[in-house]
Amino acid sequence: MKKGGEDVRVDKIKVQLLMTKGPHTQQELAAKAGISRQTLSAVMNGRNCRPELLGKISKALGVEPKEIIE
């Protein structure tokens, strides 16, 4: 994660590769992360992501946040 808790962008390709192992769909990942599918979709399509949201997504994927950012 960047210093100071700045917004970051999620690397869509890295997340998609991790999703091949499960959870397999955006709906499943969103549910596991405790966020809406719409929020996950926006992040996957390039919207900046706050550190808290990044943490939820990375935890649901079973990786460290730094592993899924651009």
Regions found by a protein language model. Give the residues of each.
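Recognition helix of helix-turn-helix/homeodomain-like DNA-binding domains
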Residues: 35-49
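Helix-turn-helix DNA-binding elements, focusing on the entry/boundary residues of the two helices
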Residues: 26, 37, 51-54
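DNA major-groove recognition helix of helix-turn-helix
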Residues: 19, 44, 61
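Short alpha-helical "recognition helix" segments of helix-turn-helix
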Residues: 29-30
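A short, Lys/Arg-rich alpha-helix, primarily the initiator
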Residues: 1-25
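Short, basic-rich loop-to-helix N-cap that marks the start of a DNA-contacting helix
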Residues: 46-59
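Short C-terminal boundary/hinge segments that cap the last helix of small helical domains
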Residues: 62-70
